[in-house]
Amino acid sequence: MGESALEPGPVPETPAGGPVHAVTVVTLLEKLATMLEALRERQGGLAERQGGLAGSVRRIQSGLGALSRSHDTTSNTLTQLLAKAERVGSHADAAQERAVRRAAQVQRLEANHGLLVARGKLHVLLFKEETEIPARAFQKVPELLGPEDQLVLGPDQPEDEVGESSEEEPVESRAQRLRRTGLQKVQSLKRALSSRKAAQPTPVKPPRVGPVRSSEGPSEGQPAAQPEMESELETALEPEPPQPTKEDPEKPVLQIESAA
């Protein structure tokens, strides 16, 4: 390109083979200088363009690096989210299994409760004493019994059977238990009545001049009425013999005795 611009062309003014004038040489040098200046300007513009392209390329490379880093961060976040989702799924499956098991247990409990309610074969027998009885009275009956207590026992139960401990006879019948509680009630009432009699002081009455039949009448009838009251209490507290009942072998019977 430079060589073609520097090639001198034919000068029409000068004849071929004639002498070259100085003016022609000067004009040719001026043209050459202007061409060189234009070439330098073009080279500077090309260098500036090349620098701009290099800057844009560097900016593009930095953008690509940031994009790759953000892509790596996003991939790591997605991996963590997937792991958390798997853990949550496993926990949800375990919770669902537990809920199913609990629902089955609740259904079984409801069925058992309905069956128990439908049967209604649970009976609770409560024995409550009016006076406090020691716990040893349930294990062994006192050996010394009065004649009245022996009459209440009757011929069905000998004294040897009453004196046996609970260790020798762990299983007691219902009739024996009722009879024993009745005897304990009678004994407690007798002790209460005897203590009440001993605590009451005999009032001292002043002597009267008139007839004493009206005043002595109630005092003579009072000790006669006292044994009658004791006999009535004994007959009322005497346990009735148990009647034979047909018990269902499948029916559970719960007996609770309270000494309070």
Curated annotation (Swiss-Prot):
Post-translational modification: In vitro, phosphorylated by PRKCD.
Induction notes from the record: Up-regulated in serum-starvated cells or during cell growth arrest.
Top-rank taxon, per record: Eukaryota
GO cellular component: caveola; cytoplasm; cytosol; protein-containing complex
Region (Interaction with CAVIN1) location: 1-84
Modified residues (Phosphoserine): 62, 70, 165-166, 173
Phenotype seen when the gene is deleted: Mice show reduced density of membrane caveolae in the arterial smooth muscle and the urinary bladder but show no loss of endothelial caveolae in lung and heart.
Statement: the UniProt record of this protein carries the keyword Hydrolase: no
Region (Interaction with CAV1): 135-200
One GO BP annotation of this record: negative regulation of phosphatidylinositol 3-kinase/protein kinase B signal transduction
Glycyl lysine isopeptide (Lys-Gly) (interchain with G-Cter in SUMO2) cross-link, chain position(s): 128
Single GO MF descriptor: protein kinase C binding
Keywords from the UniProt entry: Biological rhythms, Cytoplasm, Isopeptide bond, Membrane, Phosphoprotein, Tumor suppressor, Ubl conjugation
Region feature (Disordered): 146-260
Record has Ubl conjugation as a keyword: yes
Database matches in InterPro entries: Cavin_fam
Organ and tissue specificity: Lung, heart, skeletal muscle, liver, brain, vascular and urinary bladder smooth muscle (at protein level). Strongly expressed in uterus, ovary, mammary and epithelial cells. Also expressed in spleen, intestine, kidney and testis.
Subcellular location: Cytoplasm; Cytoplasm, Cytosol; Membrane, Caveola
Acidic residues compositional bias, start-end: 157-170
Function according to Swiss-Prot or TrEMBL: Regulates the traffic and/or budding of caveolae. Plays a role in caveola formation in a tissue-specific manner. Required for the formation of caveolae in smooth muscle but not in the lung and heart endothelial cells. Regulates the equilibrium between cell surface-associated and cell surface-dissociated caveolae by promoting the rapid release of caveolae from the cell surface. Plays a role in the regulation of the circadian clock. Modulates the period length and phase of circadian gene expression and also regulates expression and interaction of the core clock components PER1/2 and CRY1/2.
Quaternary structure annotation from Swiss-Prot or TrEMBL: Component of the CAVIN complex composed of CAVIN1, CAVIN2, CAVIN3 and CAVIN4. Interacts with PRKCD and with phosphatidylserine. Phosphatidylserine may form a bridge between PKC and PKC-binding partners and stabilize the binding. Interacts with PER2. Interacts with CAVIN1. Interacts (via leucine-zipper domain) with CAV1 in a cholesterol-sensitive manner. Interacts with EPS15L1.
Domain remark from Swiss-Prot or TrEMBL: The leucine-zipper domain is essential for its localization in the caveolae and for its interaction with CAV1 and EPS15L1.
Family (UniProt): Belongs to the CAVIN family.
Name of protein: Caveolae-associated protein 3
